[in-house]
């Protein structure tokens, strides 16, 4: 039973098989998501103001946090759907 306990604790601690889910688009009906590929452990939201109440927004999975464009902003996070 000690061996079984150690195996269970190891699996829980390693969190084997976990895949991050990030938002890729938003609409009035909700959000569209994707499961991130291996090595992509960050969700991002990159937005830039294009005019009054008009923004160009990109969302998705990434391995590294992207840099903001001129006059743009970036949010990076690492929990499911954190980039709404």
UniProtKB/Swiss-Prot annotation:
The keyword tRNA-binding does not apply. One of its GO terms (molecular function) is toxin activity. Gene3D superfamilies: CD59. Expressed by the venom gland. One of its GO terms (cellular component) is extracellular region. Disulfide bonds join 22-43, 36-61, 65-76, 77-82. It comes from the Eukaryota. The keyword Secreted applies. It is found in: Secreted. Keywords: Disulfide bond, Secreted, Signal, Toxin. Residues 1-19 form the signal peptide. Homodimer; disulfide-linked. This protein shows a synergetic toxic effect in that it enhances the toxicity of other toxins. Belongs to the three-finger toxin family. Short-chain subfamily. Aminergic toxin sub-subfamily. This is Venom protein SynTx. It comes from Dendroaspis jamesoni jamesoni. The lineage of its organism: Eukaryota, Metazoa, Chordata, Craniata, Vertebrata.
